[in-house]
Amino acid sequence: MTTLPARRLLLVHAHPDDEAIGTGATMAHYAATGAHVTLVTCTLGEEGEVHVPELAQLAAAEADQLGGYRIGELAAACRALGVTDHRFLGGAGRYRDSGMMGLATNEHPRAFWQADLDVAAGQLVEVMRELQPQVLITYDGNGFYGHPDHIQAHRVAMRAHELAAAEGFAPAKVYWTAMPQSVLEAGMTHFAGSSDNPFEGIQEAVELPFCTPDERIAARIDATGQHVAKEAAMRAHATQIPDNSWLYSIAGNFGSEFMGVEYYTLAVGDKGPGFGPYGWEDDLFAGLPVAEGSDRTPVADGADRAPVGATGQR
């Protein structure tokens, strides 16, 4: 019998750096408030670009050592976020970065895009069985922006939830990362005519694959107090996010609002009490019995064992 914090949050991301960019503030917020935060990363990000010139030979087309290097970057990012429980799905290196949609790398025999859905989902089910999180975060069906590994992460997470539900320990709520249309429109207006406009060529916010109507947003997590932690986590991924990245350009203009506020749609579960015209939640655990307090909860049946197919810092 192992005791864990009463509030337990599980995130499933495709590559190292996705956790920091998309959910870093949320992770840091819940870790700082005593929740048990677990990150499962599905690949090592072997096909990523290398933005550090002296490390260029690590690229997939050269020495193909980038994945191993990114393990260290991810560990540093987790430290910045205060997250101590990280695992790679199936173990580090089990699934390879598939590269962008339509590339030959999609067909690599270890590409995550080629993974057997039930096998990969079963590996995630073991993590769910061990930790029994109440909340799961992953991407929508388009993987937020269409990357095959993001789409596959969505499929694996949702299949794992289905399998866990059949055994009675599925997370009560499943959220998908999202960006409200109003926030994107405000950004486009702000950067219009700017030399560093990250929305160059976009006429309407709805053209962006991750644009979500405000009324479909379920939760707005204001973790502006953690914006420094999120930026530190992003900077830990130096091979992927150069100092002149448009991400930092937006942050420089919007500051803690950009770095510290993250949005989600609710895919599974009942929405809790919210605020504003659309009733946005300000807590992912809203409406759940563990929404208040930080008591520790016993977790049995496997909590003392290392999860099948999962490795990482604990």
UniProtKB/Swiss-Prot annotation:
EC annotation from Swiss-Prot or TrEMBL: 3.5.1.103
Source domain of life: Bacteria
UniProt enzyme class: hydrolase
Annotated catalysed reactions: 1D-myo-inositol 2-acetamido-2-deoxy-alpha-D-glucopyranoside + H2O = 1D-myo-inositol 2-amino-2-deoxy-alpha-D-glucopyranoside + acetate
NCBIfam families from the UniProt entry: mycothiol_MshB
Biological function: Catalyzes the deacetylation of 1D-myo-inositol 2-acetamido-2-deoxy-alpha-D-glucopyranoside (GlcNAc-Ins) in the mycothiol biosynthesis pathway.
Name of the featured protein: 1D-myo-inositol 2-acetamido-2-deoxy-alpha-D-glucopyranoside deacetylase
Organism: Salinispora tropica (strain ATCC BAA-916 / DSM 44818 / JCM 13857 / NBRC 105044 / CNB-440)
